[in-house]
Amino acid sequence: MGRMHSRGKGISASALPYKRSSPSWLKTTSQDVDESICKFAKKGLTPSQIGVILRDSHGIPQVKSVTGSKILRILKAHGLAPEIPEDLYHLIKKAVAIRKHLERNRKDKDSKFRLILVESRIHRLARYYKKTKKLPPVWKYESTTASTLVA
């Protein structure tokens, strides 16, 4: 499947391990992983950042193979899940940064065009999340209040 607003096909990706069980060399228990996930979430890290830290620093290749559930499910169980999904949050953050840039550089036509593309992506993603009930049905993206969502 191709990219939304560019020409790339996006075919490169890392291969997931075939074996879905926990590696034999891993000595960490699922309770330890749960506690560390909660600790990192309380520090303000996103689920993907938590996964990267667990992989790189703690040697946990896949949280799902160790605990049986994904990072976001663990965060939801402990009440630490973000209210806005992570990918939507980063798109809103990008739109706020582009708007801030456009306040200083009014004639930047390319940034104006890119802002339109980013905001259309936000609207499309918000429609999906409303349909899957990850966002409330009355949630709406507005460029005037977007900076408060990201701050």
Swiss-Prot record:
This is Small ribosomal subunit protein uS15y. GO terms for molecular function: mRNA binding; structural constituent of ribosome. One of its GO terms (biological process) is trichome morphogenesis. One of its GO terms (cellular component) is endoplasmic reticulum. It comes from the Eukaryota. Keywords: Ribonucleoprotein, Ribosomal protein. InterPro entries: Ribosomal_uS15 (IPR000589), Ribosomal_uS15_arc_euk (IPR023029), Ribosomal_uS15_N (IPR012606), uS15_NS1_RNA-bd_sf (IPR009068). It comes from Arabidopsis thaliana (Mouse-ear cress). Belongs to the universal ribosomal protein uS15 family.
